[in-house]
A protein has these predicted regions:
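N-terminal secretory signal peptides that target proteins for export/translocation
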Residues: 1-5
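Bacterial N-terminal signal peptides
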Residues: 8-22
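Extended, histidine- and acidic-residue-enriched regions that form the cofactor-binding/catalytic faces
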Residues: 26-145, 149-261
Length: 261
């Protein structure tokens, strides 16, 4: 953009922002992005929760391409909905719990070549998680349970490193709840400290797995957030049906993975 136009755009944005900050217009009522999470609590309420032995729950997702029919935040919607259900179950069992706002700047190697896929360096994510764990410990939490909605192996390895660091430092008892097929890919085993393996056995995966933005994820989004699914284009979409050797190329990501998709 030529300099005068760029200056005009900058000035226009700054002016608009100043006006909005001075007198924000009323907005239509809609669910808060912080609904059900620690962010809506006061510090007094949080202190009371930790004194009552509350456990912390944390969903770790990513902003990532999910085909032409699902939103970039698919991997955030799903684990958030799962933890909201977990909260309800824990409430029924009289277990005190606090849910953190979902993390969504993930490590994105597999789909990183697509527009909208935000890729964070693993060490940056690990350091951020380490700081969050330390802050939770200072707030009085003794345990935190993490889940992911984003199955990129590099993303999970960043989580694994953060969990191990927290447990070595004894800042907080950190736990990563991992589906068995993902745990197998990551080399995790039952009994590994800090890791809880759940779900079907690793060898239960079909020869042509429903990897990404397919029937499983689409069904989940239709169940928890139907308004964000572009249902009108779904009938025109064909599954990729990748063979095992193609899946390996896909998992390596970047341009080869994009082409095979």
């Amino acid at each position: 953009i030529e300099r005068p136009r760029k200056f005009a755009l900058t000035l226009g944005f700054a002016t608009a922002l100043a006006l909005c900050m001075a007198a924000p217009a009323p907005v239509a009522s809609s669910p808060s992005v912080f609904a059900g999470t620690m962010a809506e609590m006061t510090y007094i309420e949080l202190e009371a929760a930790t004194r009552n032995g509350a456990v912390a729950l944390w969903a770790l997702g990513a902003i990532e391409e999910h085909g032409p029919h699902l939103p970039l935040a698919t991997d955030v919607y799903v684990p958030t909905a799962q933890l909201l259900q977990v909260q309800q179950r824990l409430a029924q069992q009289k277990i005190s719990r606090v849910m953190l706002r979902a993390y969504y700047w993930g490590v994105n190697r597999v789909r990183g070549s697509f527009s909208g896929s935000i890729d964070i360096r693993p060490e940056v994510m690990t350091e951020l998680m380490t700081d969050v764990f330390r802050s939770l410990s200072k707030a009085g939490f003794k345990q935190v349970f993490c889940i992911t909605g984003h199955y990129d192996a590099a993303h999970s390895r960043a989580i694994i490193e953060a969990v191990r660091r927290a447990n070595r430092a004894a800042d907080i008892e950190a736990n990563y709840v991992v589906p068995n097929p993902l745990a197998f890919r990551l080399g995790l085993k039952v009994g590994d400290a800090g890791f809880i393996l759940v779900g079907p056995p690793a060898n239960a995966a079909p020869a042509r797995p429903d990897l990404h933005a397919g029937q499983a994820q689409t069904s989940l989004l239709l169940s928890i957030a139907p308004d964000v699914v572009r249902s009108e284009i779904m009938p025109s979409l064909k599954p990729t049906d990748l063979m095992p050797e193609e899946v390996e190329v896909w998992r390596n990501g970047y341009e080869p993975g994009k082409r095979i998709t």
